[in-house]
Amino acid sequence: MSTVPLTLDEIFDLARKTLLANGCDDETASILSDLIRNAERDGSLSHGLFRLPAYVSGLKSGKINGKGKPEIKKISSSVIKVQGNNCLAPVVLNKGLPELAKAAKENGVAVLAINNSHHMAAMWPDTEKLAEEGLVAFACTSYKPAVAPAGAIKPLFGTNPISFAWPRPGKTPVVYDMATASMAMGEVQVAKREGHKVPLGTGLTKDGKETTDPGAIADGGVLLPFGGYKGSAIAMMVELMACLLYTSDAADEYDR
């Protein structure tokens, strides 16, 4: 496999031109391209250019609205909901985060929920932005089933990632972003593409057997939670907070 080195600016330009050519307006293309560039900068290959073909596929199929405009609805002074109108989640968050920060500063605490959007992408850029404004930030999201609970062999939870950021005046914030699965599915897919094995305990084959083959996990297999039953419990917490608290479907209802 051959590779072509690109600067961060070249990555941004490539992503933006590709998205514009496939149905995105300028605002959407710029938001997504900035996220892709930052993911590549921070070494998160599964959220960088690797994601571009999936975005293009979603745009071409009509599943993703590349020109949609999210709509804000304030449920209370400290609870904000954004209707995504089938935009990609980073576009929806870009609309809601300023309102969230304002509400948190005015009330001491605030919550932002988004729905009818696609692919949350990396969450740390957004929690980091909030921490840079002096706010403590926590984010989580659910998705379609890909992770078997501890002791099971069939998927029930999404990879259900969480991100946390803590402000440090005059210094960079403390930030983390992690899947509650043993590994993000995107990282498994990257390992498959590059021909790498994954650690034992990452996932199971479609027959429920342990494997180090990322292809056997990504193609019909299942991921495992990190930390056994502890990771399962945190994945369940995310499911309840990110979905059912805001009347969205749970992961096991994704295809219903």
Predicted regions and their residues:
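A generic, well-ordered mixed alpha/beta core segment in the N-terminal half of proteins
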Residues: 81-169
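Short, well-structured alpha-helical segments
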Residues: 26-37
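Generic N-terminal amphipathic, Lys/Arg-enriched alpha-helix
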Residues: 2-4, 8-22
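Active-site cofactor/substrate anionic-group-binding motifs, chiefly glycine-
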Residues: 50-97
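Secondary-shell segments that build the walls of catalytic and ion/ligand-binding clefts
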Residues: 196-245
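N-terminal and secondary-structure boundary signal
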Residues: 20-23, 42-46
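Phosphate/diphosphate-binding glycine-rich loops and adjacent basic-rich segments that engage nucleotide
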Residues: 147-215
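Single conserved hydrophobic/aromatic residue that forms the stacking wall/gate
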Residues: 246-256
